[in-house]
A protein has these predicted regions:
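Active-site helix of classical SDR
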Residues: 123, 159, 167
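Short C-terminal tail/terminal secondary-structure segment
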Residues: 148, 236, 247-262
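Short, small/polar-rich loop/turn modules that mediate ligand/substrate recognition or access, typified
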Residues: 89, 175, 180, 246-248
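Alpha-helical segment proximal to the catalytic Tyr-Lys
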Residues: 128, 172-173, 244
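Residue(s) in the substrate-gating loop at a strand-loop-helix junction
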Residues: 143
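Conserved glycine-rich cofactor-binding loop
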Residues: 9, 14-17
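Substrate-binding pocket helix/loop in short-chain dehydrogenase/reductase
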Residues: 71, 99-100, 104-112, 138, ...
Length: 262
């Protein structure tokens, strides 16, 4: 399917691996020019080269999105390089796990900075450019915890719900400017983050990591862990004109894990 993204410019954060990379790959396959950022410079530039092999232009910016001014710098560098900005995919790493009593105020602040405020700052920097051209796509990668809290991830559950509220509010404010805003909420996908959480669970439960992964699969109605590319495909669709009537929603990519109706 040709999604009509050739000539569009997409900025994707935390894109050197995992879900961010999967989003960047799908956008590149559809012909979009990319700006990607991540903290690890070596992995970032390796990803840049591989994405360029898919045919489009790729700007790589080694940045930590939590550092002051980096979200704005990332957007500025993207617009400076390409002269426009059409799509922003806001993606960051997951928060520290643990029950409520183990988290300090600083833990909550750190999670809010990384998982909520980076989304706020990327959107704030991007929206004026999108308004100017009368078209834009804001896509926030969060977690199914924005729909259904995950045990042991209380700081993340709190921040992810905030991003869902941000996106819904932006969808209402920006709808007359041709800008859509949506959340993509992954469940268990084949990423380093999933294996890290499985490793922590295995230690607490006294089982192996492989056994923890099998238990995780059994909790998913489809009885398997998803592929990052399956999320990337949805993001590419939401970034396209074909998704022009979809805004203000949160879509789970979770194999049916979330049991709620909404």
């Amino acid at each position: 399917m040709d999604l009509g993204l050739k000539g569009r410019v997409a900025a994707v954060s935390a894109a050197s691996k995992g879900l961010g990379r999967a989003c960047a790959e799908e956008l590149a396959r559809e012909g979009a020019d990319l700006a990607i950022c991540a903290r690890g410079e070596d992995a970032l530039h390796a990803t840049q080269k591989e994405l360029e092999e898919l045919g489009g232009r790729v700007l790589a910016a080694p940045l930590d999105m939590v550092e002051p001014g980096t979200c704005e710098r990332f957007i500025d560098e993207t617009v400076s390089a390409y002269g426009r900005l059409d799509i922003v995919v806001s993606n960051v790493g997951g928060p520290k796990a643990g029950p409520f009593e183990t988290h300090s105020d600083d833990d909550f602040r750190e999670t809010m900075e990384r998982n909520l405020m980076t989304a706020v700052r990327l959107a704030r920097a991007a929206v004026p450019h999108m308004k100017q051209q009368g078209w834009g796509r804001l896509i926030f990668i969060t977690s199914i915890s924005s729909k259904q809290p995950i045990e042991g991830l209380i700081t993340g559950n709190t921040a992810r719900a905030g991003v869902a509220g941000l996106s819904k509010s932006l969808s209402l404010e920006l709808v007359t400017h041709g800008i859509t805003s949506n959340v993509v909420a992954p469940g268990s996908l084949l990423t380093d983050r999933t294996y890290d959480l499985a490793s922590q669970f295995s230690k607490n439960a006294g089982i192996t990591v492989d056994e923890a992964i099998k238990r995780l699969e059994q909790d998913i109605p489809m009885k398997r862990i998803g592929k990052p590319a399956e999320l990337g495909a949805l993001v590419a669709f939401l970034a396209s004109e074909r998704a022009s009537f979809i805004t203000g929603t949160t879509i789970a990519v979770d194999g049916g894990t979330v049991r709620g109706l909404l």
